[in-house]
Regions:
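Solvent-exposed, well-ordered amphipathic alpha-helical segments
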Residues: 16, 23, 70-74
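Short, highly charge-biased, low-complexity peptide segments
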Residues: 47-56
């Protein structure tokens, strides 16, 4: 099998997941008793950020998993 260093990909994945979790927490914090239009728009914007960070985390996960497959199975 190949001698690949997967550590940077793992680090990128962990950072992406941390960003995703932080985005979820930020969105959750905006779900408050404030029923104004401004608060709702901020909450919606935070939800879009959650979606974007989720996609980034999943892409980082896939890159890491593919590197592990290449390292362990040769493909």
């Amino acid at each position: 099998m190949e001698n690949l260093n997967c550590a940077p990909l793992l680090q990128n994945y962990r950072q992406a997941v941390d960003a995703w979790v932080n985005a979820i927490r930020a969105e959750e914090a905006l779900a408050a008793n404030d029923e104004s239009m401004v608060a709702m728009e901020q909450w919606d914007t935070a939800g879009l950020h959650v979606h974007d960070t989720e996609l980034t985390a999943k892409k980082a996960r896939d890159l890491y998993k593919n590197a592990l497959r290449k390292k362990n199975y040769g493909f």
